[in-house]
Regions:
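Glutamine-centric residue-chemistry signal
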Residues: 105, 142, 163-164
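Non-catalytic DNA-recognition/assembly elements of restriction-modification systems
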Residues: 2-29, 152, 156, 164, ...
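Low-complexity, Lys/Gly-biased intrinsically disordered segments
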Residues: 16-53, 70-72, 90, 244-251
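Short, basic/aromatic beta-hairpin or loop at an interaction surface
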Residues: 49-63, 97-98
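Short, solvent-exposed loop/turn positions at domain surfaces
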Residues: 9, 31-32, 70-71, 139, ...
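Short amphipathic coiled-coil heptad-repeat segments
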Residues: 1, 8, 173-221
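Specificity-determining recognition surfaces
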Residues: 34, 126-155
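A short beta-sheet element
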Residues: 46-47, 65-125, 146
Length: 251
């Protein structure tokens, strides 16, 4: 851990600490001037279009092609880059996983990566980075993580081969967690069905063993209501011995 005296925590000896800006091509944000609007052209994303951690082009506005062409290269997202929201709902990381031209507002940062970005993606989503955002965000109405702050974030970087192993392990466990999460609805349905089945068995006299020594239910009804007259059970041929049918008001 060469030139950083005060690092946030210990890492293996083969790892290194570095600033984000030392690990990527560039860290920029969107145009600070309001872009011109257009009915057609290049999609222009705002924070609400990336708020769920994915690119969403369903309700995007557009800017003219000419405007997009004037944007500098380091502000044009490419497949493999990462978006990082810096204002308001800061700290949302969005992988650029499509080969499509688009641009974005100044409340979103663009991290142009040097190599595969999977490890960096997971690192930027970590509570460690969220803590740095919370610590250094400024402003009152809308907190902002400034670009210089973002560029200066200290990152724990493992050897590349270990990065790949870490990513595989993370994604394995995340898949399991998502499977459990996805099964919640199925589990709730199963629970409801089980409860319904238990009640169904109960009211059909199939939940507990029948004891021939039990007093018939008709005797219970007679004690509750001496004037009770048993129903004609012709439609209830499946009633068990000792059971009876009675109107609700006599219970």
């Amino acid at each position: 851990m060469p030139h950083y005296q005060n690092v946030p925590f210990e890492v293996p000896s083969s790892w290194v600490w570095c600033k984000l800006e030392d690990y990527v091509k560039s860290v920029t944000d969107g145009d600070h001037q309001a872009p011109p609007k257009s009915d057609i052209g290049i999609p222009f994303l705002v924070i609400s279009d990336v708020a769920k951690g994915k690119l969403n082009f369903l309700n995007t506005r557009f800017v003219p092609q000419e405007y997009y062409e004037k944007i500098s290269f380091d502000r044009k997202p490419e497949k493999g880059d990462l978006l990082f929201t810096v204002t308001g709902s800061y700290g949302i990381v969005v992988p650029v996983n499509i080969d499509c031209k688009f641009c974005f507002q100044r409340h979103i940062g663009l991290i142009k990566t040097l190599n595969t970005s999977e490890y960096l993606l997971h690192l930027l989503k970590s509570s460690y980075i969220k803590g740095q955002c919370d610590e250094f965000a400024t402003g009152t109405a809308q907190k902002t993580v400034g670009l210089e702050t973002l560029r200066s974030f200290l990152l724990p970087i493992p050897p590349f081969a270990e990065q790949q192993r870490i990513v595989i392990e993370i994604e394995k466990w995340f898949s399991l967690i998502e499977l459990i999460e996805g099964g919640k609805d199925d589990l709730q349905t199963t629970i409801k069905q089980a409860k319904s089945k238990i009640l169904d068995l109960a009211i059909h006299g199939k939940l507990v063993p029948q004891d021939p020594n039990d007093e018939p239910a008709i005797e219970l009804l007679k004690r509750i209501n001496p004037d009770f007259t048993p129903c004609d059970n012709g439609h209830y041929t499946q009633l068990l011995n000792g059971w009876t049918v009675a109107p609700m008001q006599v219970l």
